[in-house]
């Protein structure tokens, strides 16, 4: 926690906020329309924290992602006791899911 406090006091929270700013800009929405309807066809794995509200804010969105965006979805993993920052909150469990997924293709 002290690391984050030190970094935010040095840089502010600009890095984290810039993603949200850019995703809401009209110019970037037009650029992203180029990818509309394109599917991710490589094997994919969705990992999220079980306490991250983002996975639950739109019921059915994970199923829609599997059906329309990721045609080769191999799994959905929820990490217990993790929220939005799953890789920072539970790095070992996150790594284990990624390692297991990748080694299944070697």
Feature locations, PLM:
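Alpha-helical elements of Rossmann-like donor-binding domains used by nucleotide-donor carbohydrate transfer enzymes
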Residues: 3, 15, 19, 64, ...
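Short, low-complexity, polar/charged sequence segments that are solvent-exposed and flexible
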Residues: 23-25, 64-68, 75, 95-98
